[in-house]
């Protein structure tokens, strides 16, 4: 352990008195849980907001036959940057789960408190819902025009609640006639398992190939790679993103926006798949005898990171 002195932000600069007082209140154990939940909510908000914004351009561009509004490449990058921003901005306050799969993995493999996990998951779903509402508001004029166009073309019933319809900006659906539910399940399960392994690799403090500063990019690019390769056959990867956005779609278009049996796959299958990915990493890649010096961290910080 390094003998370098521990320097706090308050040692380097003074904050306004109102912020200093608020910090004391915020860091109190009775209040801090709300700060953690806000961080989880806002982290999910960030990547869903950027991801749905690019998805809106893609869907609307296809409906109005306007090319170059967006692309699968752009959507993948939007989600990747959103995840990167979320980790960089919010993880120091909450630990940076931003995904019910990750939270449940911490419960199972790290002893994360169950009540705290429930709070996190609710906050994560809320973040996706708020992001969806904001994207809908910002794209509302074009969404309404596209909806009216589908009605006039008598294509509303066949297109609206598909990946090619305005509701598909928010809720995830299968491409009609192009993907079966079993294949969608396979697609979701395999990719969620891989994502789980990659996240756990980034969190492994002894994994010298992925130092802490590279972790956010490592995880973000994993999501981008899956979107680039498997978004078209349908992939969700995140219960909060799927359920929060789907609930919003149902708030606008009613129960039809809930989708078919695929909705349960998109919402739930990533959970056991991620747990399997973490289990595989723990079995085949984690090594308790593998050491690594952590000179910039003290015991209190380590406890916060791994709890």
UniProtKB/Swiss-Prot annotation:
Write out the GO cellular component annotations: plasma membrane
Induction of the gene = Expression is reduced fourfold during ectomycorrhiza formation. Expression is highest at 15 degrees Celsius and decreases at any other temperature.
What does it catalyze? Answer: H2O(in) = H2O(out); NH4(+)(in) = NH4(+)(out); urea(in) = urea(out); glycerol(in) = glycerol(out)
* Gene Ontology MF term list: glycerol channel activity; water channel activity
SUPFAM superfamilies the record matches: Aquaporin-like
Point out the signal peptide segment.
Answer: none
Extracellular topology ranges: 62-68, 142-157, 204-216, 286-307
Please provide the record's keywords in A-Z order: Membrane, Repeat, Transmembrane, Transmembrane helix, Transport
Main localization (coarse): membrane
Chain ranges for the short sequence motif NPA 2 as given in the UniProt record: 167-169
UniProt-annotated location(s): Membrane
Entries under PANTHER family matching the protein:
AQUAPORIN 3 (PTHR43829:SF14), AQUAPORIN OR AQUAGLYCEROPORIN RELATED (PTHR43829)
Please state what the annotation says regarding this protein's domains.
Aquaporins contain two tandem repeats each containing three membrane-spanning domains and a pore-forming loop with the signature motif Asn-Pro-Ala (NPA). Lacbi1:387054 has NPC/NTA motifs which is in accordance with the fungal aquaporins (NPx and NxA).
In Swiss-Prot or TrEMBL terms, this protein is called Aquaporin Lacbi1:387054
Q: Which source organism does the UniProt entry give?
A: Laccaria bicolor (strain S238N-H82 / ATCC MYA-4686) (Bicoloured deceiver)
């Amino acid at each position: 352990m390094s003998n370098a002195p521990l320097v706090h932000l308050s040692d380097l600069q003074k904050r306004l008195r109102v912020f200093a007082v608020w910090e004391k209140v915020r860091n109190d154990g009775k209040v801090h849980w709300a700060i953690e939940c806000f961080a989880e909510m806002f982290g999910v908000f960030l990547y869903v907001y950027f991801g749905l914004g690019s998805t809106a351009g893609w869907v609307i561009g296809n409906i109005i036959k306007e090319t170059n509004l967006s692309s699968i490449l752009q959507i993948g990058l939007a989600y990747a940057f959103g995840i990167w921003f979320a980790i960089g901005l919010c993880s120091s306050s909450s630990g940076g789960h931003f995904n019910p799969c990750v939270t449940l993995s911490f419960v199972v493999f790290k002893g994360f408190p169950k009540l705290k996990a429930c709070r996190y998951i609710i906050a994560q779903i809320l973040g996706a819902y708020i992001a969806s509402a904001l994207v809908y508001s910002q794209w509302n004029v074009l969404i309404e025009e596209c909806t009216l166009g589908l009605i006039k073309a008598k294509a509303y019933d066949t297109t609206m609640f598909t990946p090619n319809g305005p509701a598909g900006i928010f809720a995830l659906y299968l491409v009609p006639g192009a993907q079966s539910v079993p294949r969608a399940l396979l697609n979701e399960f395999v990719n969620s398992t891989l994502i789980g392994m990659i996240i756990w690799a980034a969190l492994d403090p002894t994994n010298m190939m992925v130092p802490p500063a590279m972790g956010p990019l490592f995880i973000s690019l994993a999501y981008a790679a899956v979107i680039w390769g498997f978004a078209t056959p349908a992939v969700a990867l995140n219960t909060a993103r799927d359920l929060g956005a789907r609930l919003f779609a149902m708030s606008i278009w009613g129960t039809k926006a809930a989708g078919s049996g695929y909705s349960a796959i998109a919402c739930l299958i990533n959970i056991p798949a991620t747990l399997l990915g973490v289990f595989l990493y723990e079995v085949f890649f984690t090594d308790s005898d593998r050491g690594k010096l952590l000179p910039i961290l003290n015991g209190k910080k380590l406890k916060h990171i791994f709890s």
